[in-house]
Amino acid sequence: MEIPIKIIQASKSDLAEIETLQASSFPAEKQQPSHILEESIRKCADTFLLARDENQLLGYILGGPYPHNPKCLEIHSLVIDTDHQRQGLGTLLLAALKDVAVELDYKAIRLKSPDELLSYFEMNGFIDEEETDSLYAASQGFSRIWFNLF
């Protein structure tokens, strides 16, 4: 029997699990401090989404308003537990964030991507920002963007 994955909004009670997952995924210098994560839960509750099974945090995506354009979201983190990578959880979280973006009337989602993940984000509908000629295309160092066409 397969255990269903739930996508839920992060809450303060999830903070310890989020920190544990982050610590197992990033070196110390790339981890967000606890107070920043807590502030993100408070300020970005709609766009801080968790993937959970019955009793374990499997991954999360954290997005927030892009400071230079409040109608655009920026993905700050996409983290999947190493034992659950390559099982579609990242794609599930990206799809959930896109749904939230449509619901909240954001016009686009931006992200920075390391070279080894470019094709993954392209598969999920993100395009090279340099290929766009829109007000969202700017030389802010973002390499991928998804447009809300709804």
Q: Where does each model-flagged region fall?
A:
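Conserved acetyl-CoA-binding loop-helix of GNAT-fold acetyltransferases
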Residues: 80, 86-99
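Conserved active-site tyrosine of GNAT-family acetyltransferases
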Residues: 121-122, 126
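A short beta-loop-alpha structural element at the N-terminal edge
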Residues: 4-18
